[in-house]
Structures are given as C-alpha cells and as structure tokens.
C-alpha cells in the first residue's frame, strides 16, 4: 500500500511540492474615465442614474508556474439618454502557482485569482469616479465562481455545436 496522497504533485527534484499561490505583482494595464457631459452632468439629480457594469477575466501562462490574470471592469452611468460617465479598468496580477493538480488550475485562475485582485480594482474604480466629480462607485462583490461555471457551460455548448 502507498502512503502517497492522491493527486500529489512532485517538483523538479522529485520531492513533493507544497501547494502555494503567491502574488508576484499587481498592475494597472489600462484605466480610462470619461465624463462627456461635464460640468453639466455633475449637477444634483432627482433620481440615481442607471449603472451598467461588465466584468471579464482572462488568464495567460507566462511560464510553467507563473500566470498573468487580468480582470476587466467597465462601468457606465446613464441618466435617460445622457451618459454621465464611462470608465474602464484593466487590472492584472502575476501569480506563481505551485503544487496544484492540473484539474484545479482553471478554477484557481478564474475564481481565486480574480477574487484576490477585485478589492484593489474596486478601489481604483471608486477613486476614479470620485475624482471625476461623482460619488464613488462601490461595485458589489462579484461571484467569480458563478462566472466561471457560466463560462464553462458556454464553452461546452460551443464544442457540442461544433461536433
């Protein structure tokens, strides 16, 4: 009988690698804020504007253990047909992931990594809207697990159609 745990991962010298996730860097790749109607759009309003938020996550390998995970947040505030502001943030992180079985890599990259990046990206968006003359936009927490499941279902449906 073997004493080895199922799914055990070995490092290059044959020793068992301890599972680890480290953030090597975080960075703003792109940040834009537009307020096309300013200063008129800054006046007090009787009702809150409609705010649409889009979120996207991408991950790319940099090496065998390092991955670039990019969180894109787009927010647009509209009052009737007037665009009050439009902001976009592309925020990335370089993650070193070791000792994780391959079958757990996608959930780690598309759920846990963006979950770690989100509070920083949220603060940048809040600061940008506040500095633009509006109340800070505090984006609600995002369910990255649900986003990942939806993404996997869409990819599965696409591959089923191609078959």
Curated annotation (Swiss-Prot):
* BP term (GO), one: protein tetramerization
Protein name, per record: Protein-export protein SecB
Matching entries from Pfam families are given as: SecB
Query: Cellular component per GO?
Result: cytoplasm
| Cystines in this chain | none
Its assembly, as annotated, is: Homotetramer, a dimer of dimers. One homotetramer interacts with 1 SecA dimer.
Source organism of this protein record: Brucella anthropi (strain ATCC 49188 / DSM 6882 / CCUG 24695 / JCM 21032 / LMG 3331 / NBRC 15819 / NCTC 12168 / Alc 37) (Ochrobactrum anthropi)
Q: Describe the task this protein carries out.
A: One of the proteins required for the normal export of preproteins out of the cell cytoplasm. It is a molecular chaperone that binds to a subset of precursor proteins, maintaining them in a translocation-competent state. It also specifically binds to its receptor SecA.
* UniProtKB keywords: Chaperone, Cytoplasm, Protein transport, Translocation, Transport
Keyword Kinase assigned: no
Task: Report the GO molecular function annotations.
Answer: unfolded protein binding
* Subcellular location, record wording: Cytoplasm
Sequence similarity: Belongs to the SecB family.
